[in-house]
């Protein structure tokens, strides 16, 4: 919900004290049977007599694609050109002379013409093959495809046992482990110096699973019995893995490139499938390798073994007439299905949560694009019902029935503060919380109407907000926390997401609590973009766009931890800006060397000429020289790596020496400049006008770099990508780019441009969410 919408809802909520205590608490002395009877009667559907809601519930539902919401989001395909129109013939002038051509020239012209025609045909064919699903109407949503062919999945390589002298040690003695157990021990050894390996829960879960695998594989080969984790020493294994890492780093760029090309060639057949005769990209076509589960936050299953997945565990899905991909030698597929009502190509059950993993089409595929489109259209459809929903939950905040009152408060919190619905978690799942699963200790009340939320949300990210709520909502939360409730008790003890979502679907087909987050994120983004003036540089417009995006990310609690390299990145950016400032000062000094009188004529222009101290300039000089030396040293190594790979003669050391001599000349120039205060005039600096033009360019670069640095610092703890990809309708970003003349490449990466191609090609600058 936007800030304006929140204030509107809060204003409309009544603050009367009457009937604050629900009926169930005022009638405690009634018999249990009569209470149950009254409760059933009171909790029956309350909207049968409500004219506005009955109209909504009786309204015949239509397919989302064909239902108009404010304006058509997808324009009709452009009209075809008339087949009868012919190009006008150019009248031959009397002065035109016909040039004779030789037979050879005629053949070359014919060949060139043929090549051009082939190129045009190729382009036309490519355009014809491109499937623009957003220009079509999907008549049957249950059928996902008619034909589907693919090449299966790629399995991780089999385990390679460690060299015979690399062992796990127990009580100081080397242990001969079977390969299956050695692999699992290696998973822990590789993480020995990480935070995971120091986590007692991680250690316990790993050790239990390690002992299980050890038992399954027959136990240690040299008879040493392993009982306690604390007596295990993984150091030798860890050192070996570190050595392997270092050896990989020592590979030349050409060797790395060769490995990458070979891998890409091997993966090529798995990257694409054939869907209804079209070539579509596959997303995750690799089966996850075995490893230790990390999990986010304080996950109770962290450290458990993710077991190796075999072909026998995998179900493939493809057309009946499609060739079945061959299973790896010595194996067979678990099952072959031909289900065209699902989108997945392969699936298997993983052992950590006993849940299914799927191989699906890539984000830029037609099926994924249609799924995204429907999600955002569903959220967009909510705006036709949101006023009625808000009116009803405002009224129900004073309902005599506790369940109705809890539903009203929950929808208020989901709508105003973008809380997730939440649900019960089992003991072996992370203790993450949403609205319906809030407990007594997660909510602190500060009169008159301040609420402090403090809990772990999705992915164990802390949700901490101190907010003001409507007085009636505050009173209800006070009631929900009354004795005998205490820490550990559910706040919404009569409510769960299924009850809430079933209730919401009385308003709109398919409406769930999740749709509110998408709606409020997109609505907030629309409102924020409307406030941006269409002026300034592209960098300034992007800064304002990111500020709008950040507002949404904060609303949705999309946080991230500050990266380890953030401080270093900021320092580098500041150094770069300082160097640009120094270059600008040098230019202005050069101007005065050409015309000293300008200092009196334009004193303001030269105000900053002494902003940098000699120490500042010396530091800048050293940075530039060090960077130049490193650049040439790396260039020398890179060139020789390439020549060595291609078996060419290596560059001599004298070449590096020659490059470094140029750097030394620059160093001497800087030293002289620092001493005299005069700049060595370049040949291009032969006029004041030319140098002033360079100053102007430097000022633009300084401004752009400063804006980018500010943006980076402001977004260091906020994840803009999560809301941009999953919650903000991509058409809003497209409209922003078209309306404000910002290149789409500045907002969407190449991957996102492919994912949201439907949005880029379907709206103009006047589209509204």
UniProtKB/Swiss-Prot annotation:
For biological process, the GO terms are: chromatin organization; chromosome segregation; DNA replication; DNA strand elongation involved in DNA replication; DNA topological change; mitotic chromosome condensation; nuclear migration; rDNA heterochromatin formation
Q: Where are residues bearing Phosphoserine located in the sequence?
A: 14-15, 24, 49, 76
The keyword Phosphoprotein is assigned to this record: yes
One GO term of the cellular component aspect?
Answer: nucleus
Q: Which UniProt keywords apply?
A: DNA-binding, Isomerase, Nucleus, Phosphoprotein, Topoisomerase
Q: What class of enzyme is it?
A: isomerase
CDD domains (UniProt xref) = Topo_IB_C, Topoisomer_IB_N_htopoI_like
State a single Gene Ontology molecular function: DNA binding
* Region Disordered, annotated ranges: 1-132
In this chain, composition skew of type Low complexity spans 71-85
Where are the annotated segments for Interaction with DNA?
357-358, 420-425, 512-514
Q: Cite the record's Basic and acidic residues compositional bias ranges.
A: 91-132
Q: Sorted alphabetically, which InterPro entries does this protein's record hold?
A: DNA_brk_join_enz, DNA_topo_DNA_db_N_dom1, DNA_topo_DNA_db_N_dom2, TopoI, TopoI_C_dom, TopoI_cat_a-hlx-sub_euk, TopoI_cat_a/b-sub_euk, TopoI_cat_euk
Q: What catalytic reaction does the record list?
A: ATP-independent breakage of single-stranded DNA, followed by passage and rejoining
Which SMART domains does the record cross-reference, listed alphabetically? TOPEUc
Localization annotation = Nucleus, Nucleolus; Nucleus, Nucleoplasm
Q: Provide the family line.
A: Belongs to the type IB topoisomerase family.
Note in the entry: In yeast, topoisomerase I seems to be dispensable. This is thought to be due to the abundant presence of topoisomerase II that can substitute for the relaxing activity of topoisomerase I.
What is this protein identified as?
Answer: DNA topoisomerase 1
What is the species listed in this Swiss-Prot or TrEMBL entry?
Saccharomyces cerevisiae (strain ATCC 204508 / S288c)
């Amino acid at each position: 919900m936007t800030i304006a919408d929140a204030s509107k809802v809060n204003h409309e909520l009544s603050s009367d004290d009457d009937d604050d205590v629900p009926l169930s608490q005022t009638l405690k002395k009634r018999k249990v049977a009569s209470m149950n009877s009254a409760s059933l009667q009171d909790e029956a559907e309350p909207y049968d007599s409500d004219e506005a809601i009955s109209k909504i519930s009786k309204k015949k539902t239509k397919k989302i694609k064909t239902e108009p919401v404010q304006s058509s989001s997808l324009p009709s395909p452009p009209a075809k050109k008339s087949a009868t129109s012919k190009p006008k013939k150019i009248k031959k002038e009397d002065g035109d002379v016909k040039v004779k051509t030789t037979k050879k020239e005629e053949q070359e012209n014919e060949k060139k013409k043929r090549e051009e025609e082939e190129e045009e045909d190729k382009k036309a064919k490519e355009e014809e093959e491109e499937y623009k699903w957003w220009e079509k109407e999907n008549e049957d949503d249950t059928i996902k495809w008619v034909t589907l062919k693919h090449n299966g999945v790629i399995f991780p390589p089999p385990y390679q046992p460690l060299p015979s002298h690399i062992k796990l040690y127990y009580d100081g003695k080397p242990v001969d482990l079977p390969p299956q157990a050695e692999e699992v021990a290696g998973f822990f050894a590789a993480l020995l110096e990480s935070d995971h390996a120091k986590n007692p829960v991680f250690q316990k879960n790993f050790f239990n699973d390690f002992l299980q695998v050890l038992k399954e594989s027959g136990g240690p080969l040299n008879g040493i019995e392993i009982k306690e984790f604390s007596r295990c020493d993984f150091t030798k294994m860890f050192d070996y893995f570190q050595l392997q890492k270092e050896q990989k780093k020592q590979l030349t760029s050409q060797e790395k490139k060769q490995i990458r090309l070979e891998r890409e060639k091997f993966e090529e057949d798995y990257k694409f499938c054939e869907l209804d005769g079209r070539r579509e990209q596959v997303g995750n076509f690799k089966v996850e390798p075995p490893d230790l589960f990390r999990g986010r936050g304080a996950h109770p299953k962290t450290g458990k073994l993710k077991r190796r997945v075999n072909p026998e565990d995998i179900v493939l899905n493809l057309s009946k007439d499609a060739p079945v991909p061959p299973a790896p030698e010595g194996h067979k597929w678990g099952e072959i299905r031909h289900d065209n009502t699902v989108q997945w190509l392969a699936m298997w059950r993983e052992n950590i949560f006993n849940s299914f993993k799927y191989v699906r089409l890539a984000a830029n595929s037609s099926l994924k694009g249609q799924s995204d489109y429907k999600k955002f259209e569903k959220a967009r459809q909510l705006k036709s019902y949101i006023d009625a929903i808000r009116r009803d939950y405002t009224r129900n905040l004073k309902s005599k029935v506790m369940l109705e009152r809890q539903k009203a408060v929950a929808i208020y919190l989901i709508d105003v503060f973008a809380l997730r619905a939440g649900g019960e978690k089992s003991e072996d799942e992370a203790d993450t919380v949403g609205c319906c699963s809030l407990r007594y200790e997660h909510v602190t009340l500060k009169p008159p109407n301040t609420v402090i939320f403090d809990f772990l949300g999705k992915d164990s990210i802390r949700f901490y907000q101190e907010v003001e709520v409507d007085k009636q909502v505050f009173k209800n939360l006070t009631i929900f926390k009354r004795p005998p409730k205490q820490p550990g008790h559910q706040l919404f003890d009569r409510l769960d997401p299924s009850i809430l979502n079933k209730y919401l679907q009385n308003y709109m087909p398919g409406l769930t609590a999740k749709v509110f987050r998408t709606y409020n994120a997109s609505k907030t983004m629309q409102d924020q973009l409307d406030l941006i003036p269409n002026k300034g540089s592209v960098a300034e417009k992007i800064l304002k766009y990111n500020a709008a995006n950040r507002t949404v990310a904060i609303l949705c609690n999309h946080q991230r931890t500050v990266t380890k390299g953030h401080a270093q990145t900021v320092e580098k950016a500041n150094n770069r800006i300082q160097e640009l400032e120094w270059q600008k000062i040098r230019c202005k000094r050069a101007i005065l060397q050409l015309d000293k009188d300008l200092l009196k004529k334009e004193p303001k222009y030269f105000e900053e000429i002494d902003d940098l101290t000699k120490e500042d300039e010396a530091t800048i000089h050293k940075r530039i020289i060090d960077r130049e030396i490193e650049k040439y040293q790396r260039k020398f190594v890179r060139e020789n790596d390439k020549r060595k790979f291609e078996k060419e003669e290596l560059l001599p050391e004298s070449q590096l020496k020659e490059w470094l001599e140029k750097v030394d000349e620059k160093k001497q120039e800087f030293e002289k400049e620092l001493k005299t205060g005069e700049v060595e005039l370049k040949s291009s600096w032969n006029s004041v006008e030319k140098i002033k033009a360079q100053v102007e360019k430097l000022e633009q670069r300084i401004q752009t770099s400063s804006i980018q640095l500010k943006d980076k610092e402001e977004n260091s703890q906020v994840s803009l990508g999560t809301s941009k990809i999953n919650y903000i309708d991509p058409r809003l970003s497209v409209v922003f780019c078209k309306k404000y003349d910002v290149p789409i490449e500045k907002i969407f990466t190449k991957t996102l441009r492919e994912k949201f191609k439907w949005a880029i090609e379907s709206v103009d600058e006047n589209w509204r969410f």
